[in-house]
């Protein structure tokens, strides 16, 4: 039989915030006695946009923007009830999106 596992996916535009958050999660899980695999960096999604600088003239003049979405994956193996309680209490930065699957 497979042991219970918590899979945590983190997404953010700022890689420093996502690295800090994943480090906090790892420290919390290890402190409560669970085993942690990760953080595993997943591929960064890059969206590029080109916008004309002017409305009517200078078609060749365009500005280019990009949005980078950084992702990390954490697996917590054999979590205890204390591990889950501590993860619920964890305060993460506003720019980090977290998805937890058990």
Swiss-Prot record:
One example of a Gene Ontology biological process annotation: translation
PROSITE patterns found in the cross-reference section: RIBOSOMAL_S10 (PS00361)
A single GO molecular function term of this UniProt record: tRNA binding
GO CC terms, sorted: ribonucleoprotein complex; ribosome
Domain of life assignment: Bacteria
Keywords: Ribonucleoprotein, Ribosomal protein
Coiled coil: none
Family classification: Belongs to the universal ribosomal protein uS10 family.
Function: Involved in the binding of tRNA to the ribosomes.
This protein's name: Small ribosomal subunit protein uS10
Source organism of this protein record: Akkermansia muciniphila (strain ATCC BAA-835 / DSM 22959 / JCM 33894 / BCRC 81048 / CCUG 64013 / CIP 107961 / Muc)
Name of encoding gene: rpsJ
């Amino acid at each position: 039989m497979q042991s219970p596992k918590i899979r945590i996916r983190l997404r953010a535009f700022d890689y420093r915030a996502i690295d800090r958050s994943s480090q906090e999660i790892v420290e919390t899980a290890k402190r409560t006695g669970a085993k942690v695999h990760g953080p595993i960096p997943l591929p960064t999604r890059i969206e590029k946009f080109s916008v004309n600088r002017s409305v009517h003239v200078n078609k060749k003049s365009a500005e280019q923007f990009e949005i980078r979405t950084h992702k990390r994956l954490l697996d917590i193996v054999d979590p205890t009830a204390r591990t889950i309680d501590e993860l619920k209490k964890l305060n993460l930065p506003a720019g980090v999106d977290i998805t937890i699957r058990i």
